[in-house]
Amino acid sequence: MESSIAPPIDKKALQPQVAREVWKQELADAVRDPSELCDLLNLDSVVAEKAKKANRDFPLLVPRGFISRMRPGDLNDPLLLQVLPRLEELDDVPNFVSDPVGEQAARQGTGLIQKYHGRCLLLVTSGCAVNCRYCFRREFPYAESGASPSSFAAAVGKVALDSSIQEVILSGGDPLLVDDAILKDLIEKLALIPHVQRL
């Protein structure tokens, strides 16, 4: 039986190992092991074992600062539910599709997706700072789509050739995880395309 009173979280254990206020360091220090997450939140080892089993296809990734906002000992904490791998993720579900928003058919290669006239989605990266369990792109084939800085020139070229594209949406993963200089270069190149009005 679970106790309604849990011991407090050890806040020092949640701090990045290198005391720098740099997002890249915070991401490097993020928790990737379900057992560590459960230990930090005073959750039962049974929960950790179940989370480990569900962790294989879409691994846990959660920054320590995010964990510090979770209620210790509370399996129903909404922030915990967002990141904790659960065995239900492994269940076969009738009518489940791995591409719920239909992006596969709209792929234009070189990291571009175009589902609607006048706009396209440019996949800048496959990574995020947090792996949310509800992510609709968790099974997206990023390697096949060309979502990487090396493919940006081809993507920008394709946008430049299609005068119907007025809006380019940077997506991924989280485009803000890309190095600032690379992102700046991409934005500057898109800004040179006369028909692109919105980014």
Task: Give, region by region, the residue ranges found by the protein language model.
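Conserved Radical SAM active-site core
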Residues: 84, 96-123, 133-199
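Flexible, acidic/Gly-rich N-terminal and inter-domain linker regions that tether
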Residues: 1-114
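Short pre-active-site segment immediately N-terminal to redox-active cysteine/selenocysteine motifs
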Residues: 127-131
